[in-house]
Regions:
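C-terminal accessory/tail domains of diverse enzymes
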Residues: 1-45, 58-173
Length: 173
């Protein structure tokens, strides 16, 4: 990935891609992060690294999933360090902007991939990519982030519910 910056102590940037079933997330991520933490590997994430999560949309309605993620952005972004939020970071303004279009189709026709919720991955992979989390080799952080995102897109919403932005978990569930 051209956006990853090497350091003097870790001169070889690597990108790790993990594909697994949601039901296997915990065991797979624990194993991957265990290997990355071995002294012989000594993988580390610096500020140029990001955790990008692709959420499978093959069995979900992408329009509804996008709306749920869109209206949950405040919660998602407030959980992250300030350097990952586009309102406080020039880097995030360039590579991870907050989505402003409220519908999937509206966002997809006008945007590039450098948004908190990347809709461009849907055409190629049938996923929505969430780009905002900072890079990490901590399995617990990765697992909890993916579980949160999965809960958001899988939440039951009544047909007559009006989507609105939310700021706390209690408002969402």
């Amino acid at each position: 990935d051209g956006s990853i910056s090497a350091t003097d102590t870790h001169p070889n940037p690597i990108e790790v891609t993990v594909l697994c079933k949601e039901s296997e997330l915990e065991s797979v991520m624990a194993a991957v992060c265990k290997v990355l933490s071995l002294p012989s590997v000594d993988a580390r994430a610096n500020n140029s690294c990001g955790l990008h999560v692709h959420l499978d949309m093959r069995n979900r309605k992408v329009d509804e999933a996008y709306k749920k993620l869109f209206h949950s952005q405040s919660i998602m972004l407030n959980m992250l360090p300030s350097n990952r939020r586009s309102d406080t970071s020039p880097w995030a303004q360039q590579y991870c902007q907050r989505n402003k279009a409220g519908t999937f189709s509206e966002h997809d026709k006008t945007s590039n991939r450098y948004f908190n919720i990347n809709t461009k991955s849907f055409t190629k992979f049938k996923t929505l990519e969430i780009r905002s989390h900072s890079g990490t080799v901590n399995a617990t952080k990765i697992i909890n982030w993916v579980k949160l995102l999965t809960m958001i897109v899988s939440a039951e919403v009544l047909p007559d519910t009006t989507f609105r932005s939310i700021n706390t978990f209690s408002e969402f569930f």
